[in-house]
Amino acid sequence: MRPKKDGLEDFLRLTPEIKKQLGSLVSDYCNVLNKEFTAGSVEITLRSYKICKAFINEAKAHGREWGGLMATLNICNFWAILRNNRVRRRAENAGNDACSIACPIVMRYVLDHLIVVTDRFFIQAPSNRVMIPATIGTAMYKLLKHSRVRAYTYSKVLGVDRAAIMASGKQVVEHLNRMEKEGLLSSKFKAFCKWVFTYPVLEEMFQTMVSSKTGHLTDDVKDVRALIKTLPRASYSSHAGQRSYVSGVLPACLLSTKSKAVETPILVSGADRMDEELMGNDGGASHTEARYSESGQFHAFTDELESLPSPTMPLKPGAQSADCGDSSSSSSDSGNSDTEQSEREEARAEAPRLRAPKSRRTSRPNRGQTPCPSNAEEPEQPWIAAVHQESDERPIFPHPSKPTFLPPVKRKKGLRDSREGMFLPKPEAGSAISDVFEGREVCQPKRIRPFHPPGSPWANRPLPASLAPTPTGPVHEPVGSLTPAPVPRPLDPAPAVTPEASHLLEDPDEETSQAVKALREMADTVIPQKEEAAICGQMDLNHPPPRGHLDELTTTLESMTEDLNLDSPLTPELNEILDTFLNDECLLHAMHISTGLSIFDTSLF
């Protein structure tokens, strides 16, 4: 059977001499599979090592700073071709040479190395303040996507996926070369690529084909089989484990092929403390958490909420707006008896007035009764009209069998963990001032503190100041009120509300977008409120924005009078700086930012 030639044209930037040696090696390997030659007679293992070494030398000579990526792609394509030619043969004709036995393990090593370098390209760019161009980032994301999918089914026939990996890698290399010719790549980005795209270690790749007796490469099948069984990371089976030594390098969130949509980053310095402060001990839960809690239906507690009810939580058909002068409401309740009306009046009279907020529902007169005779004598105050207008626009009535307060909801980490809704304040924080008028308690509008990202001028303010209501005008007590006026609590001075800040407080979606924007700017700016936060006793922001070692490398490169040829051996100072990248303390912080924020839209691919 003749060898497949569809993969020989996908190699990147090879000289004609290397292509000729490659074609001869693939032909001899197919002849070994057909039992026309023996593997020892044509030295398949040694020639495979030499061709992989030629890939690395060619990439170092002409691949510039991203030569490691080119060498990895060429080696991956070479072993994929050997793998595809092996599976096309029958079982009795295949698997009688060292390369055929060790091919799955070598393929696993190459794919793991490709995933490591592409992951590091995205993970460690924010920690070192490296801006990735849009075209290069999009092409690199496609390459990472195809490589990760292949890593889970590497033992099967690669076929089309091999072509997809090589096509994506070729697109990345072409974008890098084009932008390099146009002078659009900075020295910092090129140094970052040289550090990220490392070359595969051939000694580790061919460790399964080294004889335990002589210490050299061998084509003895028995010796290779015995060596594979003793390796800790290799598995001589049809389906090896999905994870390899990369599990100790990559986090669990990056080992998934399907990314989870996260609207707002969670694991940011100071966000957990703010979350605990806002959640509190009682009454602290968002709309989404309360909706999926085990405490019953969500609309039974919506009297305590400030925002409008969600469309997914419809009110009961009987819960409609009822005003004193509404004729439609009185006509709809024509069937109510005098007994029901008296029971409602007695229940309203016996309920405490200064405790939890009551329902805004008024007594509904029967047919023929004059509606609201007490309000006709006194002029309607402007604050009363505002409350009536708010009640008409937002009819919310609690269920009689349910309590009028929102019970605490147990927070479950990782389950529907989002900050879409607005948090409820604590009852003792003075967020609502109640007024009693004619046996009916009216609650003034409350201002609920939304989520503010670390670094926002509102993030370091005390919680009572953020929860304090802004007085809209003088509140006049009614003349006929028998209850004493509530004593106002001393409130902390509220910060000056600018038009931009008031717009952020009113629109939760805009607040979320501003939070994401602020978190993206944390990698480039220093938080100016660090000293103010320590004085106020609020969040202690001891985690400054990440500052990677590439800043030192950039300073060194800019201080040089002549251009540095990165293809030549680097100075000891630069080598020391590059070696310290692996121990960068900002890697974990940048990992959360890169995985939490959607850098590229996955729906486009």
UniProtKB/Swiss-Prot annotation:
GO terms for cellular component: host cell nucleus; viral tegument. Residues 341-353 have a biased composition (Basic and acidic residues). Residues 307-381, 447-509 are annotated as: Disordered. Keywords: Activator, DNA-binding, Early protein, Host nucleus, Host-virus interaction, Transcription, Transcription regulation, Viral latency, Viral reactivation from latency, Virion, Virion tegument. Residues 321-338 have a biased composition (Low complexity). Belongs to the herpesviridae Rta family. Interacts with human ATF7IP protein, leading to promote and regulate host genes in virus-infected cells. Interacts with RNA polymerase III complex; this interaction downregulates small RNA transcription and 5'-pppRNA production. Immediate-early transcription factor that controls the initiation of viral lytic gene expression and lytic reactivation from latency. Triggers lytic replication, and initiates a cellular senescence program in epithelial cells. Up-regulates human DCR3/TNFRSF6B by directly binding to its receptor. Globally induces a proteasome-dependent loss of SUMOylated proteins in the host cell and the loss of promeylocytic leukemia nuclear bodies. Improves the stability of the triplex capsid protein TRX1 by reducing the ubiquitination level of the latter. This is Replication and transcription activator.
